[in-house]
Amino acid sequence: MGNIFSPTHLIIILLLILLLFGRGRVAELMGDVAKGIKAFKKNMKEEEESIEDKVEMADTSQVINEESQQSQPLSVKRAAIRRKASSDSKGGKASIAKKQRVK
């Protein structure tokens, strides 16, 4: 008993399907199958583009975060210097006043 999927068996099966359903019905079914495949490919392409967009957005936001982190220390340093200068000037006056009271 040979292979069930030999070319002659497939031809006989296809002829039986054609006889049972008719040409129009088979053509309609094949059209529906083609539409389904086309819709599937379209959705796969949209999903891939969506993933690429998300990756691109993540890369962009990472670059922006890195740039802001690089520029942030300068402003933080300036603020720290200002705080230190203001606390030194206030603290300096207070310590001088304390020293004078002690004497």
Curated annotation (Swiss-Prot):
The keyword Ligase does not apply. GO terms for molecular function: protein transmembrane transporter activity. The Tat system comprises two distinct complexes: a TatABC complex, containing multiple copies of TatA, TatB and TatC subunits, and a separate TatA complex, containing only TatA subunits. Substrates initially bind to the TatABC complex, which probably triggers association of the separate TatA complex to form the active translocon. It comes from Bartonella tribocorum (strain CIP 105476 / IBS 506). Residues 48-103 are annotated as: Disordered. This is Sec-independent protein translocase protein TatA. The chain crosses the membrane at residues 1-21. Belongs to the TatA/E family. It is found in: Cell inner membrane. Part of the twin-arginine translocation (Tat) system that transports large folded proteins containing a characteristic twin-arginine motif in their signal peptide across membranes. TatA could form the protein-conducting channel of the Tat system. InterPro entries: TatA/B/E (IPR003369), TatA/E (IPR006312). The keyword DNA damage does not apply. It is a single-pass membrane protein. Pfam families: TatA_B_E.
